Structure formats: structure tokens, C-alpha cells
């Protein structure tokens, strides 16, 4: 009788498609041990969570990652795209966020299905020299992403307290450390405050957009008709993509999902992947609306026929430091202060996510763990150096252009995180039965190779055009060409190597086919004992990631 009840319980917990002959492989980590997991589905149905409660238990990683899509780098590129090209580049934002949703969901699926995040899988898969190169490029991406946060914070301090931008850059070295230190006294309240301040800025731009009333027809054309006609439009489009699709976010998202307890069953993993997809979709939809509002307001105000000469000059060289006038219609004289507070919150919240990304990149590639404040201090000191030099020499205008350069660096860095993600998430040796479907494989590779192709085209044509048009002596141009062209060739060869290299390290293994009951138990997260439907021991689901301060 007990055996019948046990078999009935097993059958109830199996997926509908299970026929007893599945070849599904079981997730294990790179050391060969079964993937740590907890199966909540075996509890009595009356105690199971409802759909919404279960979904809310997975909420957190996607919204934390989405803060990167509202950072000062995004605001800067949005403002300049609107001022220079009106609504022409809205399609870039739409495509970029659709692409971001695709790859962020792949990153989440990779972490859930393998129990390892992207940098750990890279360490296991690639040879030593390749591994160290990928680690170095990932660290450069984190530092490039930190530059807009540094400059954005400096601009906010300049507006609030009228201090020089270069001094504000120095102050950023302490501001984020203070914010990280305050987390121990109530991180959820602190993150809620940051979110409120960021969405205050969003509400301001939505209110301004309602006031200026951008023509709906032109906005829709900009969203759905691809066009690159204005001077510098290609560079601005690359900068927009670089600001939207950040390499370090892929490492971060694949690690954050491991802080959630996911059952090691077909249904459990599939449910987790679906919930993370829904959460990421909601977060990125909000981010798209905010980016749309910023570009629309900037494009409408800066192209108005009754624009004053003073504001026309500001639009000609629009930066975060001078953009508060765009909100005067809604906020009046207090526009600059409220705008500065929102930019400050945006920079600080994005820096926290960058600190976590850098920590998991270092831990995954090098198995080296640092305290968060030390990690932040190292990253921030490196990011401060170029920001300080440029702000001293070029002032706020030069600092604003540095944000665009940092966004372009992120775009060129993207293939070295994106290609491993696409390959691992489409690989049977890594994902087993949870690998991407053929439709997702085709879509993700088309989008990925399209962005990589645009990067290579812009890199080559932009550099050749600069060599032709600059006023340097011919000898200097020849010397620069000798240095840069081999680097471009190495970049292309590295992309080709990562694309066509075959995965060799297996992180999935076949279950014991000689024991059908053991395979059934594995499918349902049951213990190996056949005397009763015991729960799997609550093994650590990644305690090294469980201290991430995510809202529950």
C-alpha cells in the first residue's frame, strides 16, 4: 500500500509529457556533483504557493539588472540622440531592448539550468590564456560601465552644490562606499528609496512629454522604420546599443538567479525560467518607456521653432549637466535640483549592480573573492582616473563625450560575453534538455551577429575615415595604422575563434539508466531511498550568492 501511494505521488509530480523513457540529463556543476536544489513541489498541494506568490518569490534579479538600463550612460546617450536626430533612433532603443530581453533571459536560463553562472562556465570551458583574456575584457567592461556613473554623480553634485565637476569626480570615490555601508542597516528600504528617486525622474520626463506633445506619427516612424541619415547617426546608434546591452549584465544576471531556490525537476526549472522571463520583460518594458520619454522630450524641445538662443546652444552640446532645462515646463525653477537628485540616485544604484557584477566576474574566472567595499574601491579608482583627466581638461562637455566613448567601448566588448552565452545556452553539453530551441538559437544568433557586424563595420570605417581626415603628419598616421590595424585583425580573429570553437567540457551527465526508479526520483527531486517519498536534503543552493540583497 505504501508503495502504491509512493508511486501515485511520483506520477502526480511528473510533467504531463513524461512517458517513463526520457533521456533527460541531470544538471551537475563543473566538479561533477549534482546540481544543488530543493523541490517544493512534493509538499501537500494545500501548502503550495499560488501562482502569483510563486512568481513574486522569483522577482528581484530582473529588476535589479534593469537598473543598468536607466543609468547616467543611458540618459546621456538618449539626450544626445534626441537632440541630434529627434526620433530617428528610437528604433535602435526598441531593437536594443528586445535584444536585451532575449539575452538576459538566456543568461537567467543558463544559471537556473546549470547551477553555475557565466563566468564560472567560461573558466571551466576555455584554455588558461583565453580564460584570462576574457576575464580582463570583462573587467574592462565593468570599469567602462562605471565611468558614466562617476561622471553622472559628479554632474549631480555640481548642480546641487555648485562644486567643480572634477572635484565631484573625486567625491564619487566615497559616495558609493557610503551607500554600500548603509545596506547593512536596511537594504530593502535603501533600494526602495533609490527606486523612488529614479522613478521620480521618469515621472518628470513623462509629464514633460505630455506637455510638449511630440508628434505621434513621427515617434512611431522613429520606432518602426530603421534609418541612419544624420551626421554622426551611426556613432550615436552604436553608443545607444552600448548603453542598452552591457556585457557585465550577462554575468550578473546569470549569478543573481542562483540566489533563488529552484526545484531540480523539469517542471521546477521550466517554471523558474518562465518566471524570470516574465519579470525581465516587465522590467525592460518600463525601461523602454523611460528611454522613449527621454528621447522624445529631448527631440521635441530641441527642435522647437520657438527655442531660445540660450537653449539652442545647450541643445547643440547637450550633456547630463545641462539637461535640466528640458524639465522647466513641468518643474519650474526647482527642475535643476530635482533632476540632479534623480541623476545622483541613478548613478549610485547602477554602481551597486556594477560592484556585484565585478565581484562575480572575479570570483568566477579567478576563484578570487573580495570584500564588496574593496572591490568597489578598486573599480572606482580606476574609473575615476580617465574621468578626472577629461573633466579637468575638457570640463563638463569633455566629460559628457567620455560617457559616449565609454558606451561605445561597451558595445565593442559585447561579443566576448555574448558569444559564450549564446554557445553555452544552445549546447547540450551545458544545458541538456533545457537548451535553446532552434527558433531561439536562430533569432539570438541573428541579433548577436548583426550587432557584432555593425561594431566591426563602424570600427573599420570610422578609423579609416579618421586617418584620412585628420591633420596629423603622414608619418604619424602610418605609425598609428601599424599599431591599430593589427589590433582590429586580432579583434576579428578573436570573435571568429569564440564563434566556431567547439565546446569540450561537459557539465551535464546521464542519469543511471539501469535503475528506472532512481531516474524517476531524480526527475522529481526525491532521495535515492525507495522506502518513502523523502524530500531531498536542503543542500546549499549557492550560499555564496544568497547574501545578495534582493527584495523578496
UniProtKB/Swiss-Prot annotation:
In terms of domain of life, where is this protein from? Eukaryota
Q: Where in the cell is it found?
A: Membrane
What is the protein name stated in its UniProt record? Metal transporter Nramp6.1
A molecular function (GO) held by this record is:
manganese ion transmembrane transporter activity
What protein family does this chain belong to? Belongs to the NRAMP (TC 2.A.55) family.
Organism field: Populus trichocarpa (Western balsam poplar)
Q: Which UniProt keywords apply?
A: Glycoprotein, Ion transport, Membrane, Transmembrane, Transmembrane helix, Transport
Annotated function: Probable divalent metal transporter.
List GO terms (cellular component aspect). Answer: plasma membrane
UniProt cross-references to InterPro entries, sorted A to Z? NRAMP_fam
| Transmembrane regions listed in the UniProt entry | 55-75, 88-108, 133-155, 159-181, 189-209, 238-258, 275-295, 338-358, 377-397, 402-422, 438-458, 478-498
Q: Which residues form a coiled coil?
A: none
Q: Which gene encodes it?
A: NRAMP6.1
**Which positions carry the signal peptide feature in this UniProt record?**
none
What residue spans carry the Basic and acidic residues bias annotation?
Answer: 535-545
> How the protein sits in the membrane?
Multi-pass membrane protein
User: Which stretches does UniProt call biased (Polar residues)?
Assistant: 514-523
Tell me the Pfam families matching this sequence: Nramp
Carbohydrate-modified residues are: 11, 306
List the cysteine pairs that form cystine.
none
Q: Where is this region: Disordered?
A: 511-552
A single GO BP: iron ion transmembrane transport
Amino acid at each position: 500500500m505504501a508503495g502504491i501511494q509512493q508511486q501515485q505521488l511520483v506520477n502526480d509530480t511528473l510533467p504531463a509529457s513524461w512517458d517513463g523513457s526520457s533521456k533527460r540529463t541531470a544538471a551537475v556543476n563543473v566538479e561533477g556533483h549534482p546540481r544543488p536544489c530543493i523541490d517544493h513541489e512534493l509538499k501537500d498541494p494545500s501548502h503550495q504557493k499560488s501562482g502569483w506568490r510563486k512568481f513574486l518569490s522569483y522577482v528581484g534579479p530582473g529588476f535589479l539588472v534593469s537598473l543598468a538600463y536607466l543609468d547616467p550612460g543611458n540618459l546621456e546617450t538618449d539626450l544626445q540622440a534626441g537632440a541630434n536626430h529627434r526620433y530617428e533612433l528610437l528604433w535602435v532603443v526598441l531593437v536594443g531592448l528586445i535584444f536585451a530581453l532575449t539575452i538576459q533571459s538566456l543568461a537567467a536560463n543558463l544559471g537556473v539550468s546549470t547551477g553555475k553562472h557565466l563566468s564560472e562556465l567560461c573558466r571551466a570551458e576555455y584554455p588558461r590564456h583565453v580564460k584570462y583574456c576574457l576575464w580582463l575584457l570583462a573587467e574592462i567592461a565593468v570599469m567602462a560601465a562605471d565611468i558614466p556613473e562617476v561622471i553622472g554623480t559628479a554632474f549631480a553634485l555640481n548642480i546641487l552644490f555648485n562644486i567643480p565637476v572634477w572635484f565631484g569626480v573625486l567625491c564619487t570615490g566615497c559616495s558609493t562606499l557610503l551607500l554600500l555601508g548603509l545596506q547593512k542597516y536596511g537594504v530593502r528600504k535603501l533600494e526602495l528609496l533609490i527606486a523612488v528617486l529614479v522613478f521620480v525622474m521618469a515621472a518628470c520626463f513623462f509629464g514633460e512629454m505630455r506637455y510638449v506633445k511630440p508628434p505621434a506619427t513621427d515617434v512611431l516612424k522613429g520606432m518602426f522604420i530603421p534609418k541612419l541619415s544624420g551626421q554622426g547617426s551611426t556613432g550615436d546608434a552604436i553608443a545607444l546599443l552600448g548603453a542598452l546591452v552591457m556585457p557585465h549584465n550577462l554575468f550578473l544576471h546569470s549569478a543573481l538567479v542562483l540566489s533563488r531556490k529552484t526545484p531540480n525537476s523539469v517542471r521546477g526549472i521550466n517554471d523558474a525560467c518562465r518566471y524570470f522571463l516574465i519579470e525581465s520583460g516587465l522590467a525592460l518594458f518600463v525601461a523602454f518607456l523611460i528611454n522613449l520619454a527621454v528621447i522624445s522630450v529631448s527631440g521635441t524641445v530641441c527642435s522647437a521653432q520657438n527655442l531660445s538662443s540660450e537653449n539652442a546652444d545647450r541643445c547643440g552640446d547637450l550633456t547630463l549637466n545641462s539637461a535640466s532645462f528640458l524639465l522647466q515646463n513641468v518643474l519650474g525653477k526647482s527642475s535643476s535640483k530635482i533632476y540632479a537628485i534623480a541623476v545622483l540616485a541613478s548613478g549610485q544604484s547602477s554602481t551597486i549592480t556594477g560592484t556585484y557584477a565585478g565581484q562575480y566576474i572575479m570570483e568566477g574566472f579567478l576563484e578570487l573573492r573580495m570584500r564588496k567595499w574593496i572591490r568597489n574601491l578598486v573599480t572606482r579608482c580606476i574609473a575615476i582616473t580617465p574621468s578626472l583627466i577629461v573633466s579637468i581638461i575638457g570640463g563638463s562637455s569633455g566629460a559628457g563625450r567620455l560617457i559616449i566613448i565609454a558606451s561605445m567601448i561597451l558595445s565593442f566588448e559585447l561579443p566576448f560575453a555574448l558569444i559564450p552565452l549564446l554557445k553555452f545556452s544552445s549546447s547540450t553539453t551545458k544545458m541538456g534538455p533545457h537548451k535553446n530551441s532552434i527558433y531561439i538559437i536562430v533569432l539570438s544568433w541573428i541579433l548577436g551577429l548583426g550587432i557584432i557586424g555593425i561594431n566591426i563595420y563602424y570600427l573599420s570605417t570610422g578609423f579609416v575615415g579618421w586617418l584620412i581626415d585628420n591633420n596629423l603628419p603622414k608619418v604619424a598616421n602610418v605609425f598609428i595604422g601599424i599599431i591599430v590595424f593589427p589590433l582590429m585583425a586580432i579583434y576579428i580573429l578573436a570573435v571568429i575563434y569564440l564563434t566556431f570553437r567547439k565546446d569540450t567540457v561537459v557539465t551535464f551527465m546521464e542519469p543511471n539508466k539501469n535503475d528506472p526508479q532512481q531516474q524517476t526520483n531524480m526527475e522529481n527531486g526525491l532521495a535515492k531511498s525507495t522506502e518513502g517519498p523523502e524530500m531531498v536534503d536542503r543542500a546549499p543552493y549557492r550560499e555564496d550568492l544568497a547574501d545578495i540583497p534582493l527584495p523578496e
